[in-house]
């Protein structure tokens, strides 16, 4: 998510 950490950002986001 946008408010999540970079690790999660590159996960669910992509």
Curated annotation (Swiss-Prot):
Tissue occurrence: Corpora alata and to a lesser extent in abdominal perisympathetic organs.
KW Transcription regulation (keyword) present: no
Residues with PTM Leucine amide: 14
Organism encoding this protein: Periplaneta americana (American cockroach)
Primary localization class, coarse: secreted
Protein name per its UniProtKB record: Pyrokinin-6
GO molecular function terms attached to this record: neuropeptide hormone activity
Keyword Aminoacyl-tRNA synthetase: no
Entry's family note: Belongs to the pyrokinin family.
GO cellular component terms, A-Z: extracellular region
Alphabetical UniProt keywords: Amidation, Neuropeptide, Secreted
GO biological process: neuropeptide signaling pathway
Location of the protein in the cell: Secreted
InterPro entries: Pyrokinin_CS
Superkingdom in the source lineage: Eukaryota
Matches recorded under PROSITE patterns: PYROKININ
Protein's job: Shows a weakly myoactive action.
